[in-house]
Amino acid sequence: MLVAATLGTSFSCVCPPCEAPGAQGAKPAAVVPVGSRLVVWDGEGGGIEGGKSWADCDKKGACKATLAPAPKLGKDSTNGLKFHAEGEGWQGAGWNWFGWWPETAGTDFRSYTHLTLWIKVTPKTPELAPEPGALGFLFGCSAGKKSSGSVVLGKYDKNLFDGQWHKVTVPLADFYVGKEGAEFDPGTAWEFRLNHWAGAPRNFDVILDDVAVEKQ
């Protein structure tokens, strides 16, 4: 199923991008990087406003995938962003911090070097935890609606699946490798995505908080 969640808006949207009803006038400018850290999600108004989410899975009728703001589930009992995955096969979701509008919106990542985020992975039971090598993270850009290369989050923290909060740091260069990474435009980044695949049924939540790009 494909579902969408919104934050601070009165209409819904699903992936692929759609135009806001009644949108008129000049398009807002892209977010210009300022300083050494740019937050795209913190759930408390410190990120980029107007974001929306999508979620989907490939075993229709036997899988679930959702991504939505989750009050009090963040790192400091603030608002987290919860990805729920259930069933076998592929589940994926994304948070577009522009809400897909305007279609040419984007944030310029080129002056930043690293992604940082806080993450907590909680399975329904231990045997239903995600595959350690199968929980991926990637970006999307508005230019050509391309995806970056995907990284395996477990590679950057060997204890990622212990049910506790972890700060994960990933060099942005890791997203720019391979064919997809070469086609991705870091000058128009506008979405981050999670994905997972397993051959056996899984049931788990991933909570994200304080998602940012930094100069390190």
What are these regions (language model features)?
Residues 34-36, 74-76, 110-112:
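Short, surface-exposed loop/turn motifs at beta-strand boundaries within globular domains
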Residues 88-181, 200-207, 212-214:
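Extracellular ligand-binding interfaces
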